[in-house]
């Protein structure tokens, strides 16, 4: 009898929490819904709100964003065609564009920048690029050749398996860029996404798209933020753009790219640091390998040929057999403490790697089967909005709700999983399980006949 009462109490609490989280969702997206309500029929706006919740409920990497699957969750299996038609009308409506949701993400980035302003801490805008692969598709609009990261990963040599790797594989797909706003600690905020192609009438290239975004960020946040770029941005053209826009940056330089030393010599990055001992050592946590590494740091003044202004090269050595980080920055370095700030700032770049992986694997960004580019970008923008909400649940003020959700709807025996500071995967699974068991009252009642 006691166990029955406990289960009944948990069930009542779960139904209440399902409504609470649904209300939090509405509060999160209310500003953008209000703007869309001025342009769209209220039924389409309601479909957008319902679709956001249904996307969280439908967890499947291959079919997560297939409209027929989403339609089945929206109105129930018996009315799946009607649910699919509702979503299709929303995505194909000519009265709104994906830019409305992308602008809303920019505003969330503005809020994050204002929230993170602190005299002793920097604010980071972390960039990274990726691709969305559609290897079996030929009919979708704006498909272009992209280098398959999946094929590259599968062709790595494994111990005991002797098939030699081949050259790079190129498949149909789209290019993709993502920006996060983050502080020295805590979760990052999704601020912007952009997709483009290299073929057709809308053909563009990476540097053109990235330059447009850099100019927009420079106008928006100026020198309040520090830009974090990986090796894909290394080179004189991009450094020149950063200097022209007067932005603060930390760029991981390639070891074989040349720099000019204070003596006027033109040397590769590794040659600039050759023979110089580290100035200091400390333990740095490796987010990727989940361990601490004894890391040494060295910094020296350098210049990039054809680029005006003094820059600094910070070298972080994390042990024998591991490639050092060569970090190029225009931040003034006067002591070792300033050099460590650069190293710790770049270590935050792992946040955007996790965000891209989460978008692809957990939110199924590569699964849509839409041909029209406008409809496709609208769906991606809606999913990005869902991702932004899930990240917002990591706020410290929501810790009791988050803890309850994980304990009751995604309990795990693994100690490492229980101690994860940002359990986004478990959080989405728990929320999906909760809403499937206790459907929010804001969603249409499913028809089972």
Predicted segments — roles?
Residues 2-47, 56-61, 120-121, 138, ...:
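Single, function-defining residue in the core of a domain
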Residues 35-101, 183, 227:
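Short, positively charged, Gly/Tyr-enriched micro-motifs
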Residues 52-58, 88-184, 296-301:
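Active-site-proximal, Lys/Arg-enriched surface segment
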Residues 60, 77, 165-169, 200-203:
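Short gly/ser-rich anion-binding loops that grip negatively charged ligand groups
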Residues 66, 97-105, 109, 235-238, ...:
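Poly-acidic low-complexity segments
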Residues 67-71, 103, 356-362:
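Short coil/turn segments at secondary-structure boundaries
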Residues 68, 174-177, 208-212:
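Short, contiguous clusters of charged residues that form electrostatic/catalytic patches at enzyme active sites
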């Amino acid at each position: 009898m006691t166990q029955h009462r406990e289960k009944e109490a948990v069930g009542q609490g779960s139904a209440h929490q399902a409504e609470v989280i649904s209300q939090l969702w509405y509060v999160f997206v209310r500003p953008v819904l209000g703007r869309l309500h001025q342009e769209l029929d209220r039924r389409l706006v309601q479909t957008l709100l319902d679709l956001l919740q249904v996307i969280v409920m439908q967890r499947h990497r291959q079919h997560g964003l297939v409209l027929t699957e989403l339609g089945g969750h929206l109105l129930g299996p018996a009315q799946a065609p009607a649910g699919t038609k509702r979503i299709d009308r929303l995505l194909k409506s000519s009265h709104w564009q994906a830019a409305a949701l992308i602008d809303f993400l920019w505003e969330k980035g503005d809020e994050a920048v204002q929230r993170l302003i602190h005299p002793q801490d920097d604010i980071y805008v972390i960039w990274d690029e990726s691709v969305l692969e559609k290897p079996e598709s030929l009919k979708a609009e704006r498909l272009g050749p992209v280098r398959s990261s999946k094929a590259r990963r599968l062709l790595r040599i494994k111990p005991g398996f002797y098939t030699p790797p081949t050259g790079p594989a190129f498949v149909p797909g789209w290019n993709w860029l993502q920006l996060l706003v983050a502080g020295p600690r805590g979760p990052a905020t999704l601020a912007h996404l952009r997709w483009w192609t290299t073929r057709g009438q809308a053909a563009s290239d990476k540097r053109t798209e990235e330059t447009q975004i850099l100019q927009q960020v420079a106008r928006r946040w100026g020198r309040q933020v520090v830009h974090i770029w990986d090796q894909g941005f290394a080179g004189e053209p991009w450094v020149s753009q950063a200097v022209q826009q007067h932005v603060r940056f930390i760029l991981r330089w390639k070891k074989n790219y040349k720099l000019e030393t204070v003596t006027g010599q033109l040397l590769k990055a590794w040659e600039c640091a050759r023979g110089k001992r580290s100035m200091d050592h400390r333990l740095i946590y490796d987010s990727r390998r989940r361990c601490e590494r004894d890391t040494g740091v060295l910094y020296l003044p350098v210049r990039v040929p054809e680029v005006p202004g003094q820059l600094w090269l910070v070298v972080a050595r994390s042990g024998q057999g591991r490639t050092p980080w060569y970090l190029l920055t225009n931040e003034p370095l006067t002591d070792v403490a300033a050099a460590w700030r650069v190293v710790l700032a770049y270590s935050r770049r792992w946040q955007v790697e996790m965000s891209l992986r989460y978008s692809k694997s957990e939110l199924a960004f590569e699964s849509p089967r839409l041909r029209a580019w406008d409809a496709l970008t609208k769906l991606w923008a809606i999913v990005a909005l869902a991702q932004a909400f899930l990240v917002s649940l990591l706020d410290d003020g929501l810790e009791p709700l988050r803890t309850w959700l994980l304990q009751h709807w995604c309990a795990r025996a693994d100690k490492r999983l229980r101690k994860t500071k940002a359990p986004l995967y478990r959080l989405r699974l728990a929320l999906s399980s909760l809403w499937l068991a206790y459907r929010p009252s804001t969603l249409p009642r499913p028809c089972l006949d």
